[in-house]
Amino acid sequence: MGDPRKSRRKWEGPGMPWLSQALKSEQKIMGDYGLRNKKEIWLARTIVTGYRHMARSLLALPPAERAVREKQLLGKLYKLGLLKSEQSTIDDILGLEEESLLERRLQTIVHRKGLARTIYQARQLIVHGHIAVGGRKITSPGYIVKRDEEDSIDFYPTSPFKNNPPTAGQGEVNVEQKGN
């Protein structure tokens, strides 16, 4: 992995950061997935770009070696949940978008499963240590959930939300009950 004294960033920012169309699309993605900054988008984009680059490099290999490596890459991406079926092809890898990786983040899955009312509350529950994956407390909202881990996402056993999860009605004041 290299010398720890020479740590490098794992993402690559946009070449032209001030294009209005790019700014609007990034802002929409940040709102949809509850991201804190654009670096999280750029990291997802870089990871997906790396997978697409691997798929393109497979096309140049001899057929025997290509079949082995293609099967390995497809298996890995299926286990990560980025591909829909095990019978996917390289064309499916080349069609990956950063949204497909953002859908696999723990924050997004916690919200989609209904453990949190909003995507922002999902992030807060994760950071505060209320969410566990397979019994292990995970405090990183950007944790990429594998396909086989998806069913084991729940509240951490010692969390106060384990027996009383947040629901849509909590925190709202009924105007009729308030009685001005």
UniProtKB/Swiss-Prot annotation:
Chain positions covered by the region annotation Disordered: 155-180
- Database matches in SMART domains: Ribosomal_S4, S4
Per the UniProt record, one Pfam family is S4
Q: Which Gene Ontology terms cover its molecular function?
A: rRNA binding; structural constituent of ribosome
InterPro entries xrefs: Ribosomal_uS4 (IPR022801), Ribosomal_uS4_arc (IPR022802), Ribosomal_uS4_CS (IPR018079), Ribosomal_uS4_euk/arc (IPR005710), Ribosomal_uS4_N (IPR001912), S4_RNA-bd (IPR002942), S4_RNA-bd_sf (IPR036986)
Query: What are the residue boundaries of the S4 RNA-binding domain, all occurrences included?
Result: 104-166
The alphabetized UniProt keywords are: Ribonucleoprotein, Ribosomal protein, RNA-binding, rRNA-binding
Instruction: List this protein's GO terms for biological process.
Output: ribosomal small subunit biogenesis; translation
- Looking at the UniProt record for this protein, which Gene Ontology cellular component terms does it annotate, in alphabetical order? small ribosomal subunit
Known NCBIfam families for this protein?
PRK04051.1 (NF003139), uS4_arch (TIGR01018)
Q: Which family does it belong to?
A: Belongs to the universal ribosomal protein uS4 family.
Assembly and interactions?
Part of the 30S ribosomal subunit. Contacts protein S5. The interaction surface between S4 and S5 is involved in control of translational fidelity.
Question: What does this protein's UniProt record list under function?
Answer: One of the primary rRNA binding proteins, it binds directly to 16S rRNA where it nucleates assembly of the body of the 30S subunit. With S5 and S12 plays an important role in translational accuracy.
Q: What is this protein called?
A: Small ribosomal subunit protein uS4
Q: Which organism is it from?
A: Metallosphaera sedula (strain ATCC 51363 / DSM 5348 / JCM 9185 / NBRC 15509 / TH2)
